[in-house]
Design a protein with these regions (language model features):
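Active-site-adjacent loops and short helices of periplasmic peptidoglycan-processing enzymes
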Residues: 1-80, 90-92
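Domain-terminus/edge residues, biased toward the C-terminal soluble/receptor-binding domains
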Residues: 55-56, 73-193
Length: 193
């Protein structure tokens, strides 16, 4: 949580850094309310985009990935759909360069719009420093899902994406990094395309 105060204003770009580097849930809600008119309006757009890019087993209720349920189901996805979303973000999106710039930034500092409060974000994606060719990724955690990660690597013309769900619960937050490294190494060694 970024710890925004009521009526505070921010630039969208700064909120995107807070969301993607710190996983600040309040930044996700603020973006959703401004871009979609409401959380519900934004998640409707998220669900439409997910279907458009081929995600058939994903249903978003929250803009931040937190556990939720409504009359239509539970907030859920699959490892395959998360990989498909990351593929879109790094290979197909018209904003792919912006996405990569944000998700690869080691840290980011910004002020609120009125310049009365400064905020600091730190990239928690340890995979970026683990392997040559590590491109990007996003961490996540909920009580139901455990630690999750989706990451990409580019090496010798190959782009590999690893998606991990339920990869440990506290005190095992580091499992995802070793599992990602092993899967990426396996893919580089054994996968041809």
């Amino acid at each position: 949580k970024l710890g925004m105060r009521e009526a505070e204003q921010f630039y969208l770009q700064d909120l995107l850094y807070a969301l993607m580097l710190n996983s600040d849930n309040d930044a996700a809600v603020m973006i959703a309310e401004q871009v979609g008119g409401s959380v519900e309006g934004f998640t409707e757009k998220m669900n439409l985009k997910a279907r458009e890019i081929g995600c058939e087993d994903t249903y978003f209720i929250t803009p931040n990935g937190l556990d939720a349920e409504n009359e239509n189901g539970i907030h859920s996805t699959t490892a395959e759909d998360l990989a498909r979303i990351l593929r879109y973000c790094i290979m197909e999106s018209p904003k792919k360069e912006d996405f990569l710039a944000i998700t690869r930034m080691p840290s980011y500092t910004f002020w609120n719009y009125s310049k009365t409060q400064v905020y600091q974000c730190t990239n928690h994606n340890a995979f970026l420093g683990m392997m040559d060719g590590a491109l990007t990724g996003k961490t996540g955690f909920t009580g139901n899902a455990g630690y999750c990660y989706v990451g990409a690597l580019q090496w010798e013309g190959k782009t590999l994406i690893v998606s991990l769900l339920a990869c440990g619960w506290p005190n095992n937050r580091g499992y995802k990094w070793e599992d990602t490294r092993k899967l990426m190494t396996y893919g580089l060694t054994n996968y041809e395309y």
